[in-house]
């Protein structure tokens, strides 16, 4: 599922990949061919929309695009399922417009839940079984819960205290990464972060240097993403994912959490389980991401100045941040991105996560760090637009 969704997201480009370099960001119909409905939106929002469709219906690219997965693919060709998808987008838009004043109350996921055709009859095991564990995207302050300040203060104190955190101005990290199954194994990861809002994650694949690197970069104003083995390759983030990249960079320095997220509210505590790692993990890599560990967490949600929702999950016992889910935008619903944090270790008086699982609708990257250095000089070029990939 993850492999299919990722391919669906990143391989539908038929226009020129160099569009990202334009001063004025190009829209979906300028980069992709035969776009009939999802016009006028940034490329990253368009790709997020493809991810929602894949996840909601359990599809991969080949379900809608003729020849996907082969060298004879015709991305622009109209197929019955692509035509139906356009009808569904129009239908969902009309439902929300006519009944909810345009708010996105109904999405593909509302009905499909991973099925091609929505279920129409309730299963008794669901009627009389445990209730749904799915949380609302937008949370409200629940009475009787500790204040957001108390939860955040406990977290900051646990990882080193505000004074030490205020002194954290940069860090670099090295380790290994395992991606989604179709990527053919793991790579070496480097992370560069500079206060207050610059971050670059670089994953290279020494066993397959021809494929190029996987990159996520935010320089404080602009962001780029590059995924190997795709037609689109490197592209600039200008839609909802731009704010997501900014938030990831800012939260690399936890001392500014209350400046980054405002209107903090606390929901009910919940029990969460670790997200399984990528299917490509081998037995000797499986320890990189714990699976099946349950923990009770305090749930705090805030909003960025640009309106992006972010939900933070703090371990109720230790106070550590163990998960962050942020929501991008698309014409047919919010696009979730989840980062799980574990294996906190002390580095110069500050506890930092050495294990991270970065998951989006198109795949998962499991990262295990082996080395972190704080307050080291970082070349500004690390946060610049990436050079053309070796694979393109």
Feature roles, as predicted:
Residues 2-13:
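Bacterial N-terminal signal peptides
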Residues 40, 69-94, 120-134:
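Gly/Gly-Pro-rich "capping" loops immediately C-terminal to redox-active cysteine motifs
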Residues 58-68, 105-115:
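The canonical Cys-X-X-Cys-His
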Residues 129-188, 388-392:
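N-terminal cleavable signal peptides for secretion/export
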Residues 157-231, 263-277:
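N-terminal mature ectodomain segment of secretory-pathway/periplasmic proteins
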Residues 209-212, 292-389:
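Gly/Pro-enriched, hydrophobic low-complexity segments
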């Amino acid at each position: 599922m993850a492999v299919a969704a990722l391919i669906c997201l990143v391989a539908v480009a038929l226009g020129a990949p160099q569009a990202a370099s334009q001063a004025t960001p190009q829209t979906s119909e300028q980069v992709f061919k035969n776009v009939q409905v999802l016009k006028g939106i940034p490329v990253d929002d368009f790709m997020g929309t493809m991810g929602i469709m894949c996840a909601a219906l359990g599809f991969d690219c080949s379900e809608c695009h003729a020849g996907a997965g082969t060298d004879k693919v015709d991305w622009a060709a109209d197929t019955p399922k692509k035509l139906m998808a356009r009808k569904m987008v129009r239908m969902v838009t009309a439902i929300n417009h006519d009944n909810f004043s345009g708010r996105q109350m109904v999405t593909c996921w509302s009905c499909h839940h991973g099925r091609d055709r929505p279920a129409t009859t309730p299963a008794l095991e669901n009627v009389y079984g445990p209730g749904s564990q799915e949380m609302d995207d937008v949370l409200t302050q629940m009475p009787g819960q500790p204040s957001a300040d108390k939860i955040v203060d406990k977290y900051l104190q646990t990882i080193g205290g505000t004074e030490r955190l205020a002194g954290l101005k940069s860090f670099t990290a090295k380790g290994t990464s395992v991606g989604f199954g179709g990527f053919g194994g793991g790579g070496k990861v480097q992370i560069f972060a500079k206060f207050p809002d610059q971050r670059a994650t670089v994953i290279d694949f020494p066993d397959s240097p021809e494929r190029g690197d996987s990159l996520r970069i935010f320089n404080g104003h602009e962001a780029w993403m590059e995924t190997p083995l795709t037609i689109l390759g490197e592209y600039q983030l200008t839609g909802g994912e731009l704010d997501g990249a900014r938030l990831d960079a800012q939260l690399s320095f936890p001392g500014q959490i209350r400046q980054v997220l405002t209107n903090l509210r606390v929901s009910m505590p919940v029990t969460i389980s670790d997200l399984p790692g990528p299917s490509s993990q081998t037995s000797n890599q499986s320890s990189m991401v714990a699976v099946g560990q349950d923990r009770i967490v305090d749930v705090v949600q805030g909003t960025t100045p640009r309106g992006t929702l972010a939900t933070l999950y703090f371990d109720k016992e230790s106070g550590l941040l163990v998960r962050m889910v942020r929501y991008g935008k698309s014409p047919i619903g919010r696009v979730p991105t989840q980062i799980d944090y574990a294996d906190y270790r002390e580095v110069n008086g500050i506890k930092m996560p050495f294990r991270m699982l970065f998951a989006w609708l198109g795949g998962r990257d499991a990262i295990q760090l082996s080395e972190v250095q704080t307050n080291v000089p970082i070349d500004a070029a690390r946060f610049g637009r990436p050079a053309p990939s070796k694979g393109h």
